[in-house]
Amino acid sequence: MQMRDDLGITTKLENGKAYLEFVLPETMGRLLSVLQIEIWEDADGGRLVFHGEYAPEEADSMTALLLRPHLWDGVRDPYVYLLKAQGRFGSVEYGEKMGGTKNEEESDPSEDIAEIVEVFWRQELAIYDVRVVDKKGIFLNEKEFLPHEVAYRFPPQISDVGTRVEQVRRDLERLVRMGVNVIRLEGTGTGAEGVNCSEVRTFYSLCRKRGFLTGDLWIRPKNLPVYRGLPGETTCQALLAADGRTLTERYYYYQAKWSSESVLYPALSTLHRQENGLVSLTIYSNQKKVVLYVDGVLFLFQSAASGDPEFIFEDIPVEKLPLHLAAEAGNLSISLTVTKL
């Protein structure tokens, strides 16, 4: 018996209907029995919504139709169906695999079977439609979609911050909070160097459950932020330091730019003394107004520019150190004590 999760599925939406086509993996042997395919209402096993049986001679044209399907709708509604399938397969003899000379009409197919295996599939099915319309933009299920995309690198197999799966789950939770809705897996071949196909499928499954698009947008934006930095690498776009623990200032910049979660974050790398002896500091926030206090006294408030998460405060007076700064935005506040400039 084999348990698998790699049944190929293509979907097409039209007039409130979902047309599905199932494709067996190329490595499968000959189908010897009826292949049963079922689709259940949710990934935890709810109501049965489709049951199909396909004879061996139909293996190259297995289709299904769902009326009024529940669509996967990104982070708004990351709905997935559960697909189950089972059938008996036979691995063929080496001579037949290599295109033996025996006439197919004269040979008995059963004589070429070396082994019979019962195969079961259990995997998720997300039904949705992504389209890029020239001069109009990107649409998910016919609604305009604004991509908030990052490139993702797999973590080490195991480290002091947990196993790879534990780290991926933690990463995706952080990316949800950041407001990301598209993840592009970096690497070549299977998607990442040193990662097997099963791990890549598990990663994509976790992404679907959290509402991330993966691999649907083929054009790679310039200066795409990268989630995980590498040892010895210097990139201002990395969102997580190479230690696997520390979120960088760029993470909070994009969180303030993309997330619906309230953000107020002083970018300490921008704190510096100007040529005139006064001080400058940039604060990232998605609030409408940020107020800055210097040594407990109101210094300045700034209103947000459209789509810009940066609030740049210049000419901050400093009579002596330590300098006490405090910022407020909405219901958020944060205080800083500066001892060195």
Question: What residue spans do the PLM features occupy?
Answer:
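Catalytic-core region of carbohydrate-active enzymes that cleave or remodel glycosidic bonds
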Residues: 192-224, 242, 253, 257
